[in-house]
């Protein structure tokens, strides 16, 4: 009777072990599917984030292009202003000692007026600020000389 009881207990333990292993396998399979679903969601989010980053970069690139154009326009305006300001040397900006002051033109420091440029020919500028020619003469006086 003791051996029958031992066989019965061993059989029950074997069945219990079989059921436990099947439940564990099913749980493992479900956990694997859950992990796979999580990865699919994460991948979808990463793809969406990648597209959002790409769109953000496209917007940023557009803004940079726009900013570059604005900078270019500003430089064109600045260049235009510099071109328009060429040769203007205001009396109040003079430093003296014949130094070049302002944008363009040559100031020879003739503060008393009526002096010919050091080139000796061409225009006689009241304050000595003129534009020299390539031949050595004075082409014209600076605009503030006309006032």
UniProtKB/Swiss-Prot annotation:
Q: Look up and give the organism this protein is from.
A: Glycine max (Soybean)
Cellular component annotations (GO), alphabetically ordered: peribacteroid membrane
Q: Name one GO biological process term.
A: nodulation
Q: Where is the signal peptide?
A: 1-25
Q: What segment(s) does the record annotate as region 3.5 X 18 AA tandem repeats?
A: 31-92
Tell me the keywords, alphabetical order: Membrane, Nodulation, Repeat, Signal
Which chain positions lie within coiled-coil regions? Answer: none
Q: What induces it?
A: During nodulation in legume roots after Rhizobium infection.
Which regions are annotated as sequence repeats?
31-48, 49-66, 67-84, 85-92
Q: What is this protein called?
A: Nodulin-24
Tell me if Lyase is a UniProt keyword of this record: no
InterPro entries from the UniProt entry: GRP
């Amino acid at each position: 009777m003791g051996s029958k009881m031992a066989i019965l207990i061993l059989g029950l333990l074997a069945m219990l072990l079989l059921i436990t292993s099947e439940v564990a396998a099913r749980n493992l399979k479900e956990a694997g599917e859950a992990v796979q679903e999580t990865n699919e969601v994460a991948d979808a989010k990463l793809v969406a984030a990648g597209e959002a980053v790409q769109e953000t970069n496209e917007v940023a690139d557009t803004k940079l292009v726009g900013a570059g154009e604005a900078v270019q326009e500003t430089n064109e305006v600045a260049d235009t202003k510099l071109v328009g300001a060429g040769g203007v040397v205001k009396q109040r900006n003079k430093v003296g000692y014949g130094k070049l002051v302002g944008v363009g033109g040559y100031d020879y420091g003739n503060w008393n007026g009526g002096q010919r440029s050091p080139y000796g020919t061409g225009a006689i500028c009241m304050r000595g600020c003129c534009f020299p020619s390539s031949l050595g003469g004075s082409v014209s006086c600076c605009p503030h000389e006309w006032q």
